[in-house]
Amino acid sequence: MQTITLLALLACIAVPIFADFDHLRARRDVVEASGEGSGESSGEKIVESSGEGSGESSGDKIVEASGEGSGEGSGASDAVLESSGEGSGENLSNGIVASDAPKDVKALTASEFAVSV
């Protein structure tokens, strides 16, 4: 009887020590870099960079870069890429690219739209 009690007590102590408590840990999904640096991330994270740097990410992400930097996003999933200032924005996956740089945009009239559809 004492052996069973000691084994139960030992199990109550040993199980929490060897158990995996990753779901209880606080995770930092936002990596922020400012100044002349860069922020890099992989997986489902958000990378924000400002100043003369760049933000790079792969996977499910949002990349924002401002100032004299660039933002590049590549991965197998959809991405949102925003760039402003003297930087450039490139996206190698199925996503949306928004930039403050002037671009040649042609507005379609109703008849042109009907013809293109």
From Swiss-Prot:
Annotated signal peptide: 1-19
Disordered: region residues: 31-97
Stretches with biased composition (Low complexity): 32-41, 48-57, 75-95
Record bears the keyword Glycoprotein: yes
Residue ranges the record marks as coiled coil: none
Keyword tags: Glycoprotein, Proteoglycan, Signal
Glycosylation sites: S66, S70, S74, S84, S88, N91
Protein name: Chondroitin proteoglycan 7
Lineage: Eukaryota, Metazoa, Ecdysozoa, Nematoda, Chromadorea
Gene that specifies this protein: cpg-7
